[in-house]
Amino acid sequence: MKNRTVLRINLEEGTSTYLKIPEINEYIGGEPVSIYLLSRFRESHPNTPYMSFTSGPFNGVFPYASKGVFLESIERGYTTTIGGGKLPALMNLANIDSLEVIGIAKKPSYIIVNDKEVQIIDKDKHSSLNSFGISGKRSQVEFKGKNILVDSYFKYSTNSEISNINNLKGISFSPSTNKLIGDKEQYVELYQKILEKQKEVTVTAGSYPSCFGCPLGCAFSGNTENLNVSILPRALVSCGFAENIYNNINIVFACFQVLKYDYNHDFLEAFAFKMGSFLREFNKTLEK
């Protein structure tokens, strides 16, 4: 199976670590991975402030796989939010499955990720995030009240004011990208096949800023997504309006084959049941 990587940033200690967690493969990506990582972290850190951004394996690689997952740990539980922007695509292209932020910063702070270097810097010494990273090759995250704003447009709404909890004011993410694709001819052919399924995307094209990997620019692109979507598209973090495309196991299997993942039809067909069982068991532990 693929090597899977989590970038964990500890605000309290001012440290960062790249963690190899092969068990992520069992959860594919996106929302299931974000919840699995929380469950794993809570086993040894029951009270430490925790949040994460998690990508999917098709972000930045295939059309309409254009969203990311923000998870916020709250008292006796968690919330997940789906939104757009370049962040999930850049994460996946850099082979980072999840960006975990733990602890509380001593001062209002920014996180700066440049290539593989991670810095936690004093916000008051810098007027904005714009002085970090390369425009066009970075994603910026701003924490504003109960909204998280990615790339100055894409919203991830939350239940609480994150910056008041952990003193984090923003993130500049500008990694090196090195995602490996197998047969390039097969990839281009499959990409075009999915792109041509635009009529299956249940939203009207517009002239708004598009999510990364989507040509439609719909009126909902900047909104927090609150659609009730099946677990497989949530693991791939496709747009909810493209659920019909990424709920098709034959298409998903073909995409994984091109990207050299080892998932087979049996695994994909059983995935929803397995994740349902996992979520029920984890949620029971939160109720205790």
What is each of the regions a protein language model found here?
Residues M1-I82, K86-I112, V118-K288:
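Intrinsically disordered, low-complexity segments enriched in small residues
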